[in-house]
Amino acid sequence: MSEEKLPLLSPLNENDIENDYKDENLKSDLDKLSNVKKQSIIQRFKDYLKNSISKQTATVLVYVVLYILSGVINSLLLKKVMNVFTNYGFFLNQLTNYGYVPIFGAIVLYKILFTNDIPKDTRSFPQWKFVIMGALDAVTGYFVVIGGIKTTGPLQQLLNQSVIPFTMLLSFIFLKERYSLIQLGGALIIIGGVVVSLIPSLTGGNTSGNMLFYNFFYLISMIPYAFSNVYKAIGFSTVEDMDVWYLQYFDALYQSLVGTVLFPINNWLPPPSDMKFNQVIPQLKAGGKCLGGINTLIEQYNSTTGELLPTSCNYGDNLGCDNCHGAWVVVLIYMAVNVLYNVFILLVLKHAGATVFSIANTLRLPLTNIAFSFKFIMGSDSNPFSGLSVAGLCIILLGLGGYRVGSMIKQKKEAAASADSSSNTENKVIPKVFPTQFGEVSIIIKKKVPPKSQTHLRNQFFGKLGITVPESKLRNQNSIYGDQ
């Protein structure tokens, strides 16, 4: 039985061609429909954003995101700079003080010569007030830089939040400020979170990068900073519109001068920040070399055996050796980011207000600590999370949230209690270029309300009685009693 052989190529009939043509058209139509749907979804999303978010809101969001981003980078770079200058803390303190004087001075000079932003009234502001503020900020900066050398980045961020309870206490004493139970509860929770964060240092556990003495040295910086906050509320309460660059220049100038005379404290500090009186000039010279990328403290080996000498750095408990390669690059980038960071603070405060600024500050804290744990960002300076560090972070965030909510509720109640509250109080925010950003506290400055005259009180009394006093009668009363 022979098999019927089929042709390799069977002829196509008209129906097959027509079906294939229809399939191709259908596929093309489906592709077009899919593209139309994708375009319509994207367009609808764009229209939604355009209708729901105004140009002003979008601008505020951009400023807030840039503030948070620059704040995180600023904290990371600061710790990088501290680690580079571990052996030259006093030099680093002078660098972070004097480094801003020419920058702010150039801006102020330009404004005085080519703009009207700094009128004569501003220039006549008492210099002694700048001196006091600069002195307080100098002490704060000194403790921050010296203590921060042996305090890890994540712990620095947590300790910064302790300025809130310190400022609340001093505001209660000097400004007669009263706080709600929610605010007090938030402050107590923050204190609890700080204590939890310090447990590894207190118990001698995993303290890589931390020294208990310098952890508390860093924590002490919150006290003069809290005093500075309160002083600004007192000394600058009469200032209507102080040019921020003018203020920053004189604050940085006096902070630098006062910071220079703080070197005797180093005489009693433990390594690596100890410095005898006769070592001040050599320390400054070695710090300057480190800024230029030249190592002074290097490993010393026995020429015969090749072993590390007991007197060498990196031997046992001796000081670590210098690692100054590219130090000037890190410092320049840090100072540039720090200035931009403070500009974004001003923009957020101006366009969004203190409430949004507080929320952004709260968001910045966990993001910074997370960034410190990434090795691809911090390299050998990274600090992996531990159970206690996570617990401390969560507790402090809970306390910050409580404090912020309590502050907003308190302000709303005060506004509702008095129709004139907006004219009697204001949030006075005086930015300050510090090496790091502390926990933010709203200082309420109470404006002085002028006393009411006798005429005003008489008219108010008659009005409550429903008596309308003729204007001619009022003029006679004014001439007899006079306004006081």
UniProtKB/Swiss-Prot annotation:
Keywords: Amino-acid transport, Glycoprotein, Membrane, Transmembrane, Transmembrane helix, Transport, Vacuole. It is found in: Vacuole membrane. Residues 79-94, 150-154, 200-210, 266-328, 379-382 are vacuolar. Residues 1-57, 116-128, 176-178, 232-244, 350-355, 404-484 are cytoplasmic. Nutrient transporter. Involved in maintaining the osmotic homeostasis of the digestive vacuole. Belongs to the CRT-like transporter family. This is Crt homolog 2. It comes from Dictyostelium discoideum (Social amoeba).
